[in-house]
Amino acid sequence: MGMGMMEVHLISGKGLQAHDPLNKPIDPYAEINFKGQERMSKVAKNAGPDPIWNEKFKFLVEYPGSGGDFHILFKVMDHDAIDGDDYIGDVKIDVQNLLAEGVRKGWSELPPRMYQVLAHKIYFKGEIEVGVFFQRQG
């Protein structure tokens, strides 16, 4: 079993689509979850469909540990102070192979790339660019 730190780099979004009845630019942000550890990006105020976040988030990892669901879950939202935040879509990144390799050799990386944002698992709502790095500790 290996312990380590996983760093998730949320870089940007492209073509994010949210329903805004007033046609205002969207204010996207992402909620990020890994095995119950939750993080939240900054709101990209008035960024519209192509936000730049360039934020890094750290998660403590125990691999293989308990439970077998090794996915990073992103819930992409549009901040709306007046009538509540609007759901845009989700991204699910499987990191099991990344963690297995990282435990074996000391580190591992998923270079940044675009991932499709899907609403209700089927409706394309744009993309987010994400990279992931894992470093074994001890």
Curated annotation (Swiss-Prot):
Binding site for Ca(2+) 2: D20, D78, D80, D86
Ranges for domain C2: 1-108
Known tissue expression: Sieve elements of leaves, stems, roots and flowers.
The keyword S-adenosyl-L-methionine belongs to this UniProt entry's keyword annotation: no
Essential cofactor(s): Ca(2+)
Alphabetized SUPFAM superfamilies for the sequence: C2 domain (Calcium/lipid-binding domain, CaLB)
Keywords, sorted A to Z: Calcium, Metal-binding, RNA-binding, Transport
Residues reported to bind Ca(2+) 1: D20, D27, D78, D80
GO function terms (MF aspect): metal ion binding; RNA binding
Function: Binds to both sense and antisense RNA. Interacts with mesophyll plasmodesmata to mediate its own cell-to-cell transport and potentiate RNA trafficking.
Name by which UniProt lists this protein: 16 kDa phloem protein 2
